[in-house]
A protein has these predicted regions:
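S-adenosyl-L-methionine
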Residues: 1-44, 54-61, 82-109
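Class I SAM-dependent methyltransferase "Motif I" SAM/SAH-binding loop
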Residues: 49-51
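Conserved SAM/SAH-binding beta-strand->alpha-helix loop
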Residues: 74
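A short SAM/SAH-binding and catalytic strip from SAM-dependent methyltransferases
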Residues: 113-131
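A short glycine-rich, Lys/Arg-flanked "PGG" loop and its adjoining helix->strand segment in the class I
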Residues: 132-146
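Conserved beta-strand signature within the Rossmann-like core of class I S-adenosyl-L-methionine
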Residues: 147-154
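Class I S-adenosyl-L-methionine
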Residues: 165, 170-221
């Protein structure tokens, strides 16, 4: 492991907006995120596989009336978003370092309002590990409030086609689905919605620079 990564790991251990917890144990603040961690009563939105936390931080700036929690196992990436949130005195943005496989250990029923899946690993050979698979949707249902939304933004045809199949097969209520987010679909968006999609992750910029078309959907589970 490089010295820079080690330094970032030591830094996030001191960051007040980063929580690290054992993977397989029930989190002591489960059900108490608003009260004990965010210290407010605002709705909580998750960014799963957040990487550098571009969406958690970006949405946090746009929606001060909501809490945003970026979740990833890569501490050196979380460092980027956590540092930016601290520098901007954002009390509505936090980060959790853990594996998404254990996500249900951290939240109580109905504790989360929305989920963003931004450029998740499409897992081409392991459909079960995709973050929109029945396995993971079942986990989200344990803590996502009734009528809570799942947002998916991706460059992957494989993941998006699979997600669309899950929506149709499972009968999820689909609010929005487009195979070309930045094409003519933009004409259907409000100014605020356009601003949301102007937030771009590191991977989106990378894939878009190579000509990938960005897809998006939003549905209830």
């Amino acid at each position: 492991m490089g010295k820079d990564k080690l330094w970032r790991f030591s830094e996030i251990a001191r960051f007040p907006n980063v929580t690290e917890a054992p993977f397989s144990e029930t989190f002591p603040q489960k059900g108490k995120w608003k009260e004990e961690i965010f210290k407010n009563d605002k709705p909580i939105v998750l960014e799963l596989g957040c990487g550098k936390g571009e969406y958690a931080v970006g949405l946090g700036k746009m929606f001060p009336d909501k809490n945003f929690l970026g979740i990833d196992i890569k501490g050196n990436r979380i460092y980027i978003g956590a540092k930016e949130a601290l520098e901007n005195n954002m009390d509505n943005v936090q980060f959790l370092r853990t594996r998404i496989d254990f996500i249900e250990n951290f939240f109580e029923e109905g504790e989360i309002d929305e989920i963003w899946l931004t450029f998740s690993d499409p897992q081409p050979k392991k459909p079960r590990k995709r973050l929109t698979s029945p396995l993971f949707i079942g986990r989200y249902r344990k803590f996502l409030k009734k009528n809570g939304l799942v947002h998916v933004k991706t460059d992957s045809d494989v993941l998006f086609e699979y997600t669309e199949e899950q929506i149709n097969n499972e009968g999820y209520k689909c609010h929005t689905l487009t195979w070309d987010l930045y094409g003519s679909f933009q004409n259907k968006l409000t100014k605020k919605e356009k601003e949301i999609f102007e937030i771009k992750t590191h991977y989106e910029e990378l894939f878009a620079s190579k000509g990938s078309v960005i897809k998006y959907c939003c549905f209830e589970i």
